[in-house]
């Protein structure tokens, strides 16, 4: 079977737990793209740093880690499951729903 040259995924970035906005997009990405590529392609500004495990996203849309408590920061899930690998290591196959949210807010 011919390998598709592109995949389509949906992504939502949700900062509502910290009073920020939420945005969603449907993206067409090259085959072999990662969750990191999807974030980079969705048009939301973000900051990330390279670590020994891969790219670590520390800020999205101006909302940074640890702004709302020492454990607060961005997490992602794919099809409702939280992955324990860096977003730059999670290769997408197409059809996934990616959800980024700002977690562990201390009120």
Mark where each language-model region is.
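Ubiquitin-like/PB1-type beta-grasp interaction modules and other compact soluble beta-rich domains
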Residues: 1-107
